[in-house]
Amino acid sequence: MLKQRFVLDTTALTDLQTREVMGYTSLCEGMKTILDLIAEARLHFGISCYVPYPSVYKEMYEFASRNGCDREVVAKIDTWLVKKSPDRYRVDVTSQIFHEYVSYMRERINRGMGVAEDAIWEAATECLFMENPQNKKKEYREEVEREVIGGIIGKFRNKYRAALRYGILDSAPDIDVLILAKELDAAVIASDYGIEKWAEQLGVRFVPANTFPMMIKEYLRHGPEVVKEQEDEDRKRIDYSDDADFI
């Protein structure tokens, strides 16, 4: 059997949808369970799960610490995930990929600017329709900031993130995950549309984080021990049938 290799993004351990599928409400319990599955897969099948070091490893460590996970979670990360720095200087990526990425980023930046312009116009329009007594300039300014600008800026931030960040590689760890997977000819495990999109561009296998635990369970369900037990049961059943026929 060809040994599988996987490169994990932080979302492979922290994805909310994955926890819901597995029936865990606690982030730490979900991380422990996934890491235990990885441990079994490594011991029974030699499946290797890598994490880019130090970028993604640091993210995982800080995520576990911020959410109050005990030392056992960090110990499992250190034990069962292979820490490896991606070889950024030797992994070849075609110039066409970078050309497409630059064009894609430019389009997203322009869309983000459009959202910002809409927010500014909305704020200006709201201000024009408000009373502005000169003797209450300070109070008026505070009211505008509180009642108008604050709410609009909040909406602007959400729209800007959606317009600019969704579907792009917006961090160094994202790029490290893809480079390491390309280097190792491994599959990427993540819950990130940007990573998924550019994994396809790079010809890297992608596995959604919420299906990864079920994939490992399926491997384990057909493991050598399980197959051997099934063969023993079948052999006993055949022997019993032969004895019955003889009688």
UniProtKB/Swiss-Prot annotation:
Enzyme category, top tier: hydrolase
Keywords, in A-Z order: Endonuclease, Hydrolase, Nuclease, tRNA processing
GO terms for biological process, alphabetical: tRNA 5'-leader removal
Disruption phenotype: Deletion mutant shows no growth phenotype under standard conditions or nitrogen deficiency.
Domain of life: Archaea
E.C. number: 3.1.26.5
Coiled coil: none
Described purpose of this protein according to its UniProt entry: RNA-free RNase P that catalyzes the removal of the 5'-leader sequence from pre-tRNA to produce the mature 5'-terminus.
Listed name of the protein: RNA-free ribonuclease P
